[in-house]
């Protein structure tokens, strides 16, 4: 009886946690099925999902009418460049840390953790002061360069924390064996080290891109005239725009589809390994 009660509490806690995480996302998808007002704001009435107003324009039609393509493209360009710069820097830094003395290594990780714990507004102000005394002093304007530089500065620590633990677990005998087989250091990296690190690198790519894509606080202070999706969404003053809800629901569905595909791939991989083991056992 006591064990049953503990299991009930554990399952209830898990269910409550999942509900708190995913219920808001479900609400966004449901509300996106509502119509919109004459001002283009979403109608926050769940009754409209079942009985939509024929005179109310769909949120997805509003998405097609809105000029959000420029902010979206800007956000994607900034995110991709941030990933292409931040992740290689993190990989190189992780290898350098692996060969660093413990005292210096602890200091570097302390600085990394401090940068992650620093509030975004403090980071934004420090970057504005930096650009004011460097970039702007050469009569340059705030824009893509300042945004990308800022995003790289706060993205590298995230990528480093994700990649370094994987490098720590790398078996050095694999590297030595490849060298004994005549592999050059470059060939060893691309054939052994890089495939081994790919799961961590993939995670770092996702985290860095997502962090860059939805950043508002830092971007808003260094953006200049460049608009991103985050700054565009936060610029709303009266009501929630229907196109923003429609765009959010599309992102949610894409994320769910991506997670399902990754889960299916892992399942098929495990099944393939089991089939190979069974065949090897039968042949033996």
Curated annotation (Swiss-Prot):
**Bilayer disposition of the protein:** Multi-pass membrane protein
Q: Which Gene3D superfamilies match?
A: MetI-like (1.10.3720.10)
Which positions, given as ranges, span the membrane? 13-33, 76-96, 116-136, 143-163, 189-209, 242-262
Signal peptide feature range: none
Q: Which InterPro entries match?
A: Bact_Polyamine_Transport (IPR051789), MetI-like (IPR000515), MetI-like_sf (IPR035906)
* CC per GO annotation: plasma membrane
- Keyword set, alphabetical order: Cell membrane, Membrane, Transmembrane, Transmembrane helix, Transport
- Answer yes or no on keyword Transmembrane: yes
Pfam families per UniProt:
BPD_transp_1
Q: What is its main location?
A: membrane
Return the similarity comment. Answer: Belongs to the binding-protein-dependent transport system permease family. CysTW subfamily.
Report the function annotation for this chain: Required for the activity of the bacterial transport system of putrescine and spermidine.
Q: Tell me what this protein is called.
A: Spermidine/putrescine transport system permease protein PotC homolog
Which lineage ranks, top first, belong to the organism behind this chain?
Bacteria, Bacillati, Mycoplasmatota, Mycoplasmoidales, Mycoplasmoidaceae
Gene name, Swiss-Prot/TrEMBL = potC
